[in-house]
Amino acid sequence: MIRLQSIFHSIKKFTLGYGSGLVLLGALGAIAPSTAFALYIQIDGVADIKTNFSEGCSSIKDLASQAERQKIDVVLFGDLARNSMEFGIKPFERIFKNITQGPSVLDRGASGFIAEIKENDRQFERTLLIPGVETIPFYFWSGSNYDKNLTAHNWDKHLLVFGMDSTEDFEQLPLPNSNFSKKYTHELLNNFIIIGFIFMVTVGAVYKGYFRKFTVPLMLFFALMTLNNHPFQSSPFDPYHGDQGMEPYQNLIDFATSKGALVFWNHM
């Protein structure tokens, strides 16, 4: 869940304006201590707010200022974590590829995003600002360019992640086309070792001068294959092996909740 300091911070901000009411309720509790009652506080909040870190037009400061003027208690930001789609040519799909990319938090810098939210949260007393991102955990391709029916599926299935406040956690979100990660090396290492071994054999053959007209092209081929299959992928799922069901989404949910975040479906 969202870390306790955020909750305490929210209550602190709320009580600045409503402290007298809470004192009255406390007095009532003292008068009738045996009567158990729950105190519910209704707050006004907005979620999935985009800034100029991704597809929004306004800065975090401008949005916080607007929220405070309109007496909004909580703003949960939802900028796109990574807004990138790739299609590559097999067997070198991670090297020779076409990339379609839009502005995103990880493109502009997660550290700046978090720092700006925290700084403005300190400046605006009434409104609590909570960092959050909209994520695209998975998509997959069908068809081909040759047949003119190439289609990206599940691109519109998005999850909202609220409450992470670590730059490293944002950068290690299990998203396609994202940052290098050591999290999935154990799942991807076998292919890398096998291909890397074959590459080293071809290097040895070239060094010894065996059939260089054949072994040099083979060495270059396996050099590219080794690079293409490195084990430091940002996600264990790629878009070239069809629908993976709910696994990519559950993988992101498990990662985010392990970091103390809340996760919600945004688009399905």
What is each of the regions a protein language model found here?
Residues 38-267:
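A metal-dependent hydrolase metal-coordination microenvironment
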Residues 7-38:
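Hydrophobic secretory-pathway targeting helix
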Residues 5-6, 127:
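N-terminal amphipathic/basic-hydrophobic helices that include classical n-h-c signal peptides
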Residues 11, 15, 29, 248, ...:
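Glycine/proline-rich, flexible active-site/cofactor-binding loop segments
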